[in-house]
Amino acid sequence: MGTRFLLALFLVLLVLGFEVQGAQLPQQDEPSSPTLLTQMQESLSSYWDSAKEAARGLYEKTYLPTVDEKLRDMYSKSTAAVSTYAGIFTDQLLTLLKGD
């Protein structure tokens, strides 16, 4: 048996084992009062939402169409260059590993 097969089998058995263990636990009702973790999550979520709204408002105030077009053009050119060089690097790496 190959190492990959044993690893895949181990992972499948591990997931199934956790599923079986999770099924044995009885369902608990949610506590009526929010826990500290829930309060912290809600607080952080509200801070994040307010920060997003402030950033969106600032963006809408300072929006310049010409700058936006330049940024989009720069982004498309840079991603094209990166994908080209990543393809060349991948080719070289595969050639090096494969060997002719």
UniProtKB/Swiss-Prot annotation:
Single Gene Ontology MF annotation: phospholipase binding
Name by which UniProt lists this protein: Apolipoprotein C-II
Gene field: APOC2
Listed GO CC annotations: chylomicron; high-density lipoprotein particle; low-density lipoprotein particle; very-low-density lipoprotein particle
Record keywords: Chylomicron, Glycoprotein, HDL, LDL, Lipid degradation, Lipid metabolism, Lipid transport, Secreted, Sialic acid, Signal, Transport, VLDL
GO BP annotation list: lipid catabolic process; lipid transport; positive regulation of phospholipid catabolic process
Source species, domain of life: Eukaryota
Originating species: Otolemur garnettii
Function, as annotated: Component of chylomicrons, very low-density lipoproteins (VLDL), low-density lipoproteins (LDL), and high-density lipoproteins (HDL) in plasma. Plays an important role in lipoprotein metabolism as an activator of lipoprotein lipase. Both proapolipoprotein C-II and apolipoprotein C-II can activate lipoprotein lipase.
Classification via InterPro entries: Apo-CII (IPR008019), ApoC-II_dom_sf (IPR023121)
Processing and modification events after translation: Proapolipoprotein C-II is synthesized as a sialic acid containing glycoprotein which is subsequently desialylated prior to its proteolytic processing. Proapolipoprotein C-II, the major form found in plasma undergoes proteolytic cleavage of its N-terminal hexapeptide to generate apolipoprotein C-II, which occurs as the minor form in plasma.
Gene3D superfamilies xrefs: Apolipoprotein C-II
Signal peptide range: 1-22
